[in-house]
Amino acid sequence: MPALSVPSGARSRRALRGLAAATALAVVPALGVATTATAQQGHRSTISQSSHDRQLAPRTHFTMQADGSSGLTAGGEGIPNIDSVKKTIATYYGDPGTGIADKASSPYISEMAATLEDQKTYLKTAYNHAVRQGEKPALVFDADDTTLWTYDMEVADMHFNFDPARQDVWVQEQRFPATPGMVSFVNTAAAMGFTVFGLTGRNDNQKAATVANLAKVGYTAFPEDRFYTKWTGVGSSQQPAYITCAAAKCTTVEYKAGTRKHIEDLGYDIVLNVGDQWSDLQGGYADRILKLPNPTYYLPSPDLPGLSEPRLAPRTHFTMKPDGSSGLTVSGEAIPNIDSVKKTIATYYGDPGTGISNKSASPYISEMSALVEKQQKRVVQACATGARQGTKPAIVLDADDTTLWTYDMEVADMHFNFNPAEQDVWVKDERFPATPSMVGLADAAATAGCTIVGLTGRNDNQREATLGNLAKVGYTGFTEANYYTKWTGVGSSQQPAYITCAAAKCTTIEYKSQTRRHVESAAGGGYDIVANFGDQFSDLKGGYADHAVKLPNPTYYLP
């Protein structure tokens, strides 16, 4: 869907009235289990890459409410993975991975150009109509990601974690480039005869720098007396008399709609109101609105009391490939907004906003409990059967988010931006709690006759601490001999002879699948891997297990 442009009603002085609409919330089923082909003679647990690995892939269709509430019902696989969302956003903005948007060519720039081109005919018609009616036609523009482009700040500097102190540095130093296509659009409209107003959530202390930044990048139509910023409550910067709010603190919609009403009370007709957030556009007092694409943050606000505008809301259905390539073809509105994804993940883990998951009750814990209960019966039966038949049954368990739970590190500490040095601190300090229900599964498998094998992407220097952490939280079946960590390439920690890779650096699948093959070989113990558990599809691909069990994890993606 392209950027949205809709009429705001028969007359801009009337607040918008939308049609009531009910949006059905899709409940995504809990995770399934990928089951391998029957063991073949000579390769007891080897699976067919072509037939089975194709099933081991992330979901591509999602239903997500913007407020995060889908985390209550969607299941972990039904939540857009945040790493895939980041890659999709980067692709859309032409960001090669540096956090810097391409300023010359990108899907975002192309969409902006097409969106603004579509408005030109409307502006000419609307201007001529207003003049014939003896009105003073005006346009209203938001600042951030409407006239000034914040991507480089949001991503390269803040890594999708907004910091008001850092933002103020960018504002005061006037660092922002113009939003693509907007300088020409605004200046052309001003030359046509429109009066141009700015209306932003930036505060009064940032007004002078913002107006200067706009002029610096080429805008000619934003004088300070037509540029509205929000009061700070300090000194002379107080709430204007023309704005009244239902509570002591005004909502964004109350502030912006009230300011637009004030502009119209001055005798102007707001022909078009342009913003990148729905809260820029709600509340009426404009003949038409234009929603610009922005999946990099979400600033919701309650609408005006008694006003319903169901059309002015984010989309809820998304198609997204895990590798980020969807950013080449979908519109900005069709990319899951990263702030909504974060809220959905937080809801799923019972995180109240602190970055700390609920350790007692959450949708994640419930899903893990149901999944493990189902799989434990299958695993215990396979272990018992193998033990009776003398086939040396074993289960393989990944570490992070399979046996040890990393959410608090990933969110409270790293804010969804992985830091290997900080991760090493958590590992060496043995800080991780157990992944819900997994201690019981491992114990039941061991009691039924299975050997417990650990296989992780953590390195050899982290093996001792990882085994210590596992024992600390209640696991009893892991041993040094059957716990596989990745080589560092330093000293005696070298690539094992039983692993060969297509390139100098092994992929996760090469490392893990060939380690499982080794475990099933005579040299590795001659085990029959009856089940392989992991939270990443790369933990499971490549065969050498009778069953592969994918655990939910929307907090990172390791292809």
Where are these regions (language model features)?
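C-terminal cap/substrate-recognition subdomain and adjoining C-terminal extension
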Residues: G42-R54, S106, N205-K343, P363, ...
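Structured segments of extracytoplasmic/periplasmic soluble domains
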Residues: D118, Y122-H129, T150, E154, ...
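Non-catalytic pre-domain segments flanking phosphatase-related domains
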Residues: P2-F141, P305-L397
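A solvent-exposed, charged loop/short amphipathic helix patch at secondary-structure junctions
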Residues: V155-E173, V411-D429
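Surface-exposed patches in mature extracellular/periplasmic domains of secreted proteins
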Residues: Y127-A138, F194-R202, E224-R226, V271-N273, ...
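Short, acidic loop-to-helix structural element flanking the phosphoryl-transfer center
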Residues: Q167-F197, Q206, T210, Q423-V453, ...
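Asp-based phosphoryl-transfer active-site loop
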Residues: P137-T150, G198, P393-T406, G454
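Soluble non-cytosolic domains of exported or imported proteins
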Residues: I79, D83, D102, S106-E117, ...
